């Protein structure tokens, strides 16, 4: 059970990293992404830091605000996880 929890924590950390990287590459502030996605800025900040576990719908809204498909966001997250596991 501990390994499963650990992997979930890593998943959420990677998700946050991927969101933050994409947001910064687009030149958006958290406030601007918040407005574009409809997700509260403080919640978005917590997601980016891997401190909150967003629902499927919230992740889809964030992906939309980042002008990317949900599947691409998840794919990028999986790549992040694989890179962390390899190191």
Regions found by a protein language model. Give the residues of each.
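DNA major-groove recognition helix of helix-turn-helix/homeodomain DNA-binding modules
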Residues: 57-72
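Conserved amphipathic alpha-helical interaction elements at protein-protein interfaces in regulatory
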Residues: 21, 25, 65-68, 79
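A short, Lys/Arg-rich alpha-helix, primarily the initiator
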Residues: 3-24
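Short basic helix-loop element that most often maps to the first helix and adjoining turn
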Residues: 17-36, 61
